[in-house]
Swiss-Prot record:
The gene is Agxt. This is Alanine--glyoxylate aminotransferase. GO terms for cellular component: mitochondrial matrix; mitochondrion; peroxisomal matrix; peroxisome. Its cofactor is pyridoxal 5'-phosphate. Belongs to the class-V pyridoxal-phosphate-dependent aminotransferase family. The modification N6-(pyridoxal phosphate)lysine is found at residue 231. The lineage of its organism: Eukaryota, Metazoa, Chordata, Craniata, Vertebrata. InterPro entries: Aminotrans_V_dom, Aminotrans_V_PyrdxlP_BS, PyrdxlP-dep_Trfase, PyrdxlP-dep_Trfase_major, PyrdxlP-dep_Trfase_small, SP_NH2Trfase/AEP_transaminase. The modification N6-acetyllysine is found at residues 247, 256, 330, 334. Homodimer. One of its GO terms (biological process) is pyruvate biosynthetic process. Signal peptide: none annotated. Keywords: Acetylation, Aminotransferase, Mitochondrion, Peroxisome, Pyridoxal phosphate, Transferase, Transit peptide. Residues 1-23 form a transit peptide. It comes from Mus musculus (Mouse).
């Protein structure tokens, strides 16, 4: 065989000869990893943290379906059904509605990269980690970033936002509907109309709230909204949902400069997802299996009905709050009206280390809960009731685990 290749190299010239020599000149320095000789093993756990969440059986089954080409007609039909599902859960008729092949962070960047240009004034509500992240991304773009900073656990009023709009005259306002790091749900009624009076677009992050908390993109005047797959939707992490209305689309398509990212350029993604009615154009290879799962998760919500889904989360969370109050735990968010129904934050009880509690619940009950994030790190425990997991049975399980953890975890009496 080698003689045949060597003879061919003489015929083809020096380039081919170099290729033949390369094939035989090097030895493998890295052996096959021993770990990969063993079958993959994953523990069985109840995921009651801020996400990801457990997959419903139907969604899990979708992940094992056969692979098909990402631009074949059958896949394009699935993509069309996903778009319709997003329009339902977003409550929007926006044609420019699609999936971003990346996590919620990628959706945030997709929105900001496409809407902001260097020098644009950008106003963000920073009452948790996600406002901080939005400010960081906008700063990297070269926007003039203005933050309305509030204490974690607080929300924004129309008056406060209007003062920011009048002072900074932004082209874009960013608000988080469900702030997963603090457990706050931000009221949205009136904010879209207010922004439009000041010629400003409203961008809303609904990653931790979509499907579990009422939100109406069109009726509430939200110009751009995004969410993610792994929380209430109960799909695998790694893809996100986004929608632009006509005002936001005009801002994107009338840019003076190209977006800083080719991968998240919405003008290309719109063609890939058939949002303009034209022949679809390949931009990147979409995550086919993840889209199968997302399609099924959206179908489950459509079958259940949004109002029923919202009610189930509200009832399960009320049941959880009752247990927490009986244990003497204190809610991090003082105002009951702005407590996020999908993710509850409780202050770490005095004398306890949050890591001990989280570890005990995991080790003894195979239940995942979480500590704080960003401004709430070391300060809170976070308990998530997301989609398929939002049941009173699961609440009773995690309440039992917490009670036992508080009895057995070391407590500093000083």
């Amino acid at each position: 065989m080698f003689r045949m290749l060597a003879k061919a190299s003489v015929t083809l010239g020096s380039r081919a000869a170099g290729w033949v020599r390369t094939m035989g000149s090097y030895q493998l320095l890295v052996p096959p990893p021993e770990a990969l000789s063993k079958p993959l093993s994953v523990p069985t756990r109840l995921l009651l943290g801020p996400g990801p969440s457990n997959l419903a059986p139907r969604v899990l089954a979708a992940g094992s379906l056969r692979m098909i080409g990402h631009m074949q007609k059958e896949m394009l039909q699935i993509m069309e059904e996903i778009k319709q599902g997003i329009q339902y859960v977003f409550q929007t008729r926006n044609p420019l509605t699609l999936v971003v092949s990346g996590s919620g962070h990628c959706a945030m960047e997709t929105a900001l990269f496409n809407l902001l240009e260097p020098g644009d004034s950008f106003l963000t509500g920073t009452n948790g980690i996600w406002g901080m992240r939005a400010a960081e991304i906008a700063d990297r773009i070269g926007a003039r970033v203005h933050q309305m900073i509030k204490k974690p656990g607080e929300h924004y009023t129309l008056q406060e936002v209007e003062e920011g709009l009048a002072q900074h005259k932004p082209v874009l306002l960013f608000l988080v509907h469900g702030e997963s790091s603090t457990g706050v749900v931000q009221p949205l009624d009136g904010f879209g109309e207010l922004c439009h009076r000041y010629q400003c677009l409203l961008l809303v992050d609904s990653v931790a709230s979509l499907g579990g908390v009422p939100i109406y993109m069109d009726q509430q005047g939200i110009d751009i909204m995004y969410s993610s797959s792994q929380k209430v939707l109960n799909a695998p992490p790694g893809i996100s949902l986004i929608s632009f209305n006509d005002k936001a689309k005009y801002k994107v398509y009338s840019r003076k400069t190209k977006p800083v990212s080719f991968y998240t350029d919405i003008t290309y993604l719109a063609k890939l997802w058939g949002c303009e009615g034209e022949t679809r154009v390949i931009h990147h290879t979409t995550p086919v299996t993840s889209l199968y799962c997302l399609r099924e998760s959206l179908a489950l919500i459509a079958e259940q009905g949004l109002e029923n889904c919202w009610r189930r989360h509200r009832e399960a969370t009320a049941h959880l709050h009752k247990h927490l109050q009986e244990m003497g735990l204190k809610f991090f968010v003082k105002d009951p009206e702005i407590r996020l129904p999908t993710i509850t934050t409780v202050t770490v009880p005095a004398g306890y280390n949050w890591r001990d509690i989280v570890s005990y619940v995991l080790d003894h009950f195979s239940i995942e809960i979480s500590g704080g994030l960003g401004p709430t790190e070391e300060r809170v425990l976070r308990i998530g009731l997301l989609g398929y997991n939002a049941t009173t049975e699961n609440v009773d399980r995690v309440a039992e685990a917490l009670r036992e953890a508080l009895q057995h975890c070391p407590k500093n009496k000083l």
